[in-house]
Amino acid sequence: PAAYGAPLGPPPTRGGPHAIARQARRGSTLMLPTEDSLWVGAELARRFGLPYWQVTTSATDANRFVLRLCRMLSGRDKVVVFNCNYHGSVDESQVEFDAAGRMVPRAGVHPNGVRHATTTRLVEFNDLDALEAALAHGDVAAVLTEPFMTNVGMVPPAEGFHAGLRELTRRHDVALIIDETHTISCGPAGYSGAHGLEPDFFVLGKCIAGGIPSAVWGCSQAQAERIWAVLPHFRPGQAINHFGFGGTLAGNALQLAAMRATFAEVMTEDAYRHMFQLAAQLEAGVRATLEELRLPWHVTRIGARVEYLFMTHAPRNGGEAHHARNGLIEACLHLYLLNRGVLLTPFHNMALTCPATRAEDVELHDRLLRDCLGELLERPS
């Protein structure tokens, strides 16, 4: 399983580190575009189907900037997010439902003066009726979501959910932001590309620059034209204005060199084919162990991402997934595997295969998982 912060692994030794080191010697930030920016921009448009892109230093910042744009375009204050979501440290997303179904600050996260009742509407993933009710208030600027929830266990979209989500957001003139920072493990164009989603804005981060902090956000032609219509006009070359977006190091030369190497050499069809093959092997091995031991658990895979959760079926929403978790068992599994040479990602039971993963790595994980669960089942309850 690969490191969580760079789920595709670093660029290959031949090209990626060389490109990063070469650019570092020439200068990491120039406050000017480089030729790499032209290549990366064209590749993002080709790969993800959106024509316009900006670079940030984290997916959190990308989400923040897009939300600011959506508020600017709509004149509305609120954003809809789904319960147990993950969009980095975006303030509007740091909420959850309590036992009474009320929206409250997420456990362990101080509200920091943010009055979430004025910024956020919270609904459960896959609940189109609740989503429609939230949008009907007329105060929502955007819906921000992963296409497949990944940070509370894995929650797949129900059949028809994405079609309904897109129809409702269009009907209520609400921007749809798809955050694929995790689900880029689904393929070279992410879950959206594999399943034909049509977001207004697209966010991607974490793994796209071989470990160099980087993220991007893209937008459709229609949204770009709306942005141009409301931004102040100025004469290029005679005035400078960042309009409150970006930052001094956003889009720097080192980021673009690393992104070019990663897209060209790591996020390739061949690499994903290898990752998918080993992830399927991992999924099959975990499922066989669960069936052999008659454990009421299940395993889910999307692309190169595999997760096992302590319930008989895939959860329908984040709340259901959250209630199925068991911190003590999770800690035991992680520590048992770690002490024997297998490092799972640090949250829940999720594994990512990467281009460097080998079949023997998967076999080791499966054998150790079987040993660990066997020992646990032999202990008195």
Predicted segment positions?
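Conserved N-terminal phosphate-binding loop of PLP-dependent enzymes in the Aspartate aminotransferase
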Residues: 1-381
